[in-house]
Amino acid sequence: EPENFIDKKLRARWRSYGITPMLNDKQVNVYHGLSNELPFNIQQFKGKKIVTIHDLIFLSYQQLYPFIDRKIYNKKFRNACDAADVIIAISKETKRDIEKHYFIPESKIKVVYQSCDEIYYRELQQHVKDKVQEKYKLPPEYLLYVGTIEERKNLLTLVKALKQTKEIPLVVVGNKKTYFNKVMEYITANQLQHR
């Protein structure tokens, strides 16, 4: 945590520059940037540096990101990949993208798949399931999509695939972006509302 007033008020600046001296002062052995970036001055850190890269989708699908966002992400992600001793990629596809876009040697990148909290593995009691099913008027079986409803998540492709399958209902949970309208237009035009 930032220790002085300015760093507390300007957390982004602290994460980018202020944290490194503190890591050295506290004799930290390993620093792990969990979300695609490391401080810009991390080279001054005396310990080992690890970064987890979740995706480089802003490079693969540039049309989905404003120019300035792409420039900022690219600078942060490239800096992190260059500075890290080890890069954790959350999928083989992310690993390939890092190698392709940043020319990082394969030996520096390790694929570690993400998991989820143990709470999601617990079996719910039947009365809880029944209550949720009744509240949301859910069918006995369905395909569940969870994620922001935006173009890069590719919900429209899933909806198009439904048209070619047996009667599997789709339940969508997520925040709507303008892309939602495009998905709904397709659903209406292809009479998939009942799905």
Model-derived features: where do they sit?
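Carbohydrate transferase catalytic cores enriched for Leloir-type hexosyltransferases
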Residues: E1-R195
